[in-house]
Amino acid sequence: MKLSEVFSKLIEKIRGVDYIDEAVLQELSREIQRSLLKADVPLELVKAFTDSAVKRIREEKPPAGIPPREYLVYVLYEELVKLLGGEQPAEFKPTKKPYVVLLLGVEGSGKTTTAAKLAKYLAKRGYKVGLVETDTIRPAAFDQLKQLAEKIGVPFYGERDGKNAVEIAVRGVQNFKNMDVVIIDTAGRHRNEEELLKEVKAIYDAVKPDEVFLVIDATVGKLAAAQAEAFMKYLPIHSVIITKMDSTARGGGALAAVAKTGARVKFIGVGEDVDEFELFNPRKFVARVLGMGDLDALVEKIKAVFEEDKVLEELESGRLDLLTFKKQIDSLLKLGPLSKVFQLLPSNFAIKVSEEQIELSQKNLRKWKAILSSMTMEELKHPEVLNASRIRRIAMGAGVTPKDVKEMLTVFENMKKMSKMLKRQMRMKMR
């Protein structure tokens, strides 16, 4: 079960309450505790969280016009933000050249894939990045990172038959001395964990990295604190990256546990694709978990792909025709899985788009391009003129069935609804 699923039932229950007295408050407090424990948040943090939230609900008066149940959701939101790391979104700003980043983590944490994700993230923002593999224990690590580096177009340094991880790291940094950022991947857990920690400490002393990232698998939940503290005994941990946040309810526990250690969660991995990686923003993350949507993130994604001002204006104004849709078919692929885009929408809208429709839209972009290319300009600008005979003609020209054309039009209608929702939400935010 995902973290958002754990909390969606809780939010439904809160919004189903007509009024909040002490008995209702106590019942909701227990529900909140159960939800947090399901998310694998440490027990002492659960107690502190509920005590603080209940105290605020008892003592604070909702602003005029805000129903108590909505204010309760707001308090829950605010307290979750505090629990998971505070107000400020994370930043990554290299301060020198090359800026050396050292990645640490136990075996299976997703560290090597994360090295490539971080490299892709930085390369997309204009940084020249080099990847260095120092794992001499796991032979596949060299090939894995080399292949990922080639896939994302980033230079790679490693020594397939190398025996000394420290020397490989030093040579790698020297090899990439003209890069903006050098990312060093290290070995995961050895049979002897103490040997692993000694090795990463030796690499740290040799290359003197500017930032040390600990990579933690979200599925470990509250045990994330123990992992962080074990590494902290040997060397400073400046930042944390939590992977697999899309696939487990324990992600909240991992975030809370890390925040408790004083380490800063800087990035989260939200899927398997190399593009599914983002700076951690506690407010945006909690908004998604509570089903409030994250329209800022949606707009940011749209801007990154739809660079043309006209297209963006059409999306924001709620206008979207098939001509715009046709121009952006190729760009849609750059968004990554469309399921991620729909997850950024408020839950009361996103749930209306089925997984089957999203999967269909991901698989059939090329087919749709052929369909759209078979339409006249009138049909592209005015989809309402499409009748059965026109659809048959379009299908024949595109080499598909009329059913394929209708399925594409269904997805297009969902896109139109999304743009209208975006427009309404933006108006609300401007008030």
Swiss-Prot record:
Has the keyword ATP-binding been applied to this entry?
no
Reaction catalysis annotation: GTP + H2O = GDP + phosphate + H(+)
- MF terms in GO: 7S RNA binding; ATP hydrolysis activity; GTP binding; GTPase activity
Query: Cellular component GO terms, alphabetically?
Result: signal recognition particle
SUPFAM superfamilies (alphabetical): Domain of the SRP/SRP receptor G-proteins, P-loop containing nucleoside triphosphate hydrolases, Signal peptide-binding domain
What top-level class of enzyme does the UniProt entry assign? Answer: hydrolase
Q: What is its EC number?
A: 3.6.5.4
List, in alphabetical order, the GO biological process terms annotated in this UniProt record: SRP-dependent cotranslational protein targeting to membrane
Q: Where does GTP bind?
A: 105-112, 185-189, 243-246
Q: What does this protein do?
A: Involved in targeting and insertion of nascent membrane proteins into the cytoplasmic membrane. Binds to the hydrophobic signal sequence of the ribosome-nascent chain (RNC) as it emerges from the ribosomes. The SRP-RNC complex is then targeted to the cytoplasmic membrane where it interacts with the SRP receptor FtsY.
The record's note on its domains: Composed of three domains: the N-terminal N domain, which is responsible for interactions with the ribosome, the central G domain, which binds GTP, and the C-terminal M domain, which binds the RNA and the signal sequence of the RNC.
Record-stated family: Belongs to the GTP-binding SRP family. SRP54 subfamily.
Can you state the subunit structure given in the record? Answer: Part of the signal recognition particle protein translocation system, which is composed of SRP and FtsY. Archaeal SRP consists of a 7S RNA molecule of 300 nucleotides and two protein subunits: SRP54 and SRP19.
Task: State the name under which the record lists this protein.
Answer: Signal recognition particle 54 kDa protein
